[in-house]
Amino acid sequence: MPSKQYRVDRLAQEIQKDVDEILLKRVRDPRVQNVTITGVDVTGDLQQATIYYSILSDLASDAEKAQAGLDKATGLIRSELGARLNIFKTPEIKFVRDPSVAYGSRIDQLINDLHKKEK
């Protein structure tokens, strides 16, 4: 008997793939053009999905615009997911900016600063 976690992980992968495709092909909002889906967390009961994203720009105004665009497109994305996924109830989705990308950039910057000081 397959574990429940396997199903949750498989659904998270499917949601990530489908949301990425929906953003590319169906959502026409220019605020979400530079958005990349980096991960999805689905609750054990498959009722909620947190979708993590990153953007190319480091500007706070661009991050706010991207969040507003994703919030506006949530209904369309959820209905498209409902048509694509073979599950009883489509999970509620929430978009959250992925903090690991900014953290990684900060670490790179600190390492580069150390190398410059050594020279």
Curated annotation (Swiss-Prot):
<dbReference type="Pfam" id="PF02033">
    <property type="entry name" value="RBFA"/>
</dbReference>
<dbReference type="InterPro" id="IPR015946">
    <property type="entry name" value="KH_dom-like_a/b"/>
</dbReference>
<comment type="similarity">
    <text>Belongs to the RbfA family.</text>
</comment>
<dbReference type="GO" id="GO:0005829">
    <property type="term" value="C:cytosol"/>
</dbReference>
<dbReference type="GO" id="GO:0030490">
    <property type="term" value="P:maturation of SSU-rRNA"/>
</dbReference>
<protein>
    <recommendedName>
        <fullName>Ribosome-binding factor A</fullName>
    </recommendedName>
</protein>
<comment type="subunit">
    <text>Monomer. Binds 30S ribosomal subunits, but not 50S ribosomal subunits or 70S ribosomes.</text>
</comment>
<keyword id="KW-0690">Ribosome biogenesis</keyword>
<comment type="function">
    <text>One of several proteins that assist in the late maturation steps of the functional core of the 30S ribosomal subunit. Associates with free 30S ribosomal subunits (but not with 30S subunits that are part of 70S ribosomes or polysomes). Required for efficient processing of 16S rRNA. May interact with the 5'-terminal helix region of 16S rRNA.</text>
</comment>
<keyword id="KW-0963">Cytoplasm</keyword>
<dbReference type="GO" id="GO:0043024">
    <property type="term" value="F:ribosomal small subunit binding"/>
</dbReference>
<dbReference type="InterPro" id="IPR023799">
    <property type="entry name" value="RbfA_dom_sf"/>
</dbReference>
<dbReference type="InterPro" id="IPR020053">
    <property type="entry name" value="Ribosome-bd_factorA_CS"/>
</dbReference>
<dbReference type="InterPro" id="IPR000238">
    <property type="entry name" value="RbfA"/>
</dbReference>
